[in-house]
Amino acid sequence: MKKYLLSIAALLLCLLAHSQEADDLGNYAEFSIIPRLDVNPLFGAEPEFTLGNSSLYTLFEGSASEHFSWTVASHWISWYYPDEFGLETGALYKGLGYSDSNNLFDFLKADLSFGNWTFTLGKDCITTGGHEYDDWDWLVHPQLASPLWNDLACYQWGGKVAWTTPSEMTTLSLQMTTSPFGERPFGSGLYTYSAQWSGDYDWYSPLWSVSAFGREGSEFGSAPRDYSFLVSLGNQFLLGDWTVTLDWTNTAGLNDEYSDFLAGNTFHGSVDYAPSDRWDFSLLGNYILPKKGGPVNWWNAGVIAHFFPLRDSQDLRIHAFAEYDSLLGGFELCAGILYNLTFNLW
């Protein structure tokens, strides 16, 4: 894997040297600081108060030419339980050098584009498919995300090659990354292989993928390495101000030991309505159906409202939602604010 990454890095440097001879189209750099604060009371069998997705992120992205671009997204603070600020935030830093959990760096990648081809090297999101992964983490309401989104250490080191048709309606991608089922990114010798089909066909946008996750051989198998296969079929329908999304994956989450996927099905759906640039509303939910022998079926559903008070800008977002979760046996409410403070460096 290291030789593979070094070879791609050498190729990218050669292509970058060539691209610098081109014009400066798309030459820019932006740095954003994104704080978010939530209040999130839960009402159920075990009532509690949390701070939801309260966090601090930064985003540094830009391009040196029309061919070369980069993205660095960092998660500096995580604050779910009011009295565990140091514990949760510290885990982001302690996780550096490990691949079985997300840590300080979500994205740390470079992209080179030539014609219809794009080459990516660095830390990236596993190409798992499903429109649930379209948004940045700081925009998401984890309480209404699927078990896969919440549990999978999806940011891994590797490389990807993507080809887009001349019409720009279809993109096919192949990716190789370290495996989230290995403790160390390269020392474990475990890797994930993914293929994805992404489309933009006027009113319909598919995002389908299949991934083979390398993991240690099970106690019932004879091979020192096994693979768990994740199939994800994301479907999005655009109907004027309305967007309907339905994602399906062939897993009900991850087991307690984080060594394999739980067999089953997860249906993640949303209906979004955006009547203007300053308001959007969503109905969103999940239905998790484990196979025989797994945990019980459960579901959740909620209503979300986003308001953007700044004229001609969505940098400031005020949000709220109400949700019922059958696993918790109760309701939860959330209200919060998010601000994207962006500096144009060049």
What are these regions (language model features)?
Residues 31-44, 85-104, 118-196, 335, ...:
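Surface-exposed coil loops of outer-membrane beta-barrel proteins
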Residues 169, 193-292, 299:
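Detector for outer-membrane/organellar transmembrane beta-barrel domains
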Residues 31-41, 72-76, 121-123, 172-178, ...:
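Transmembrane beta-barrel strands of outer-membrane/channel proteins
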Residues 5, 17-35, 47, 125-127, ...:
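Outer-membrane beta-barrel biogenesis signature
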Residues 303-309, 330-346:
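Outer-membrane beta-barrel "beta-signal"
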Residues 39-47, 78-84, 127-131, 167, ...:
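Gram-negative outer-membrane beta-barrel proteins
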Residues 66-70, 116-119, 167-172, 201-208, ...:
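Repeated loop/turn-to-beta-strand initiation elements of outer-membrane beta-barrel proteins
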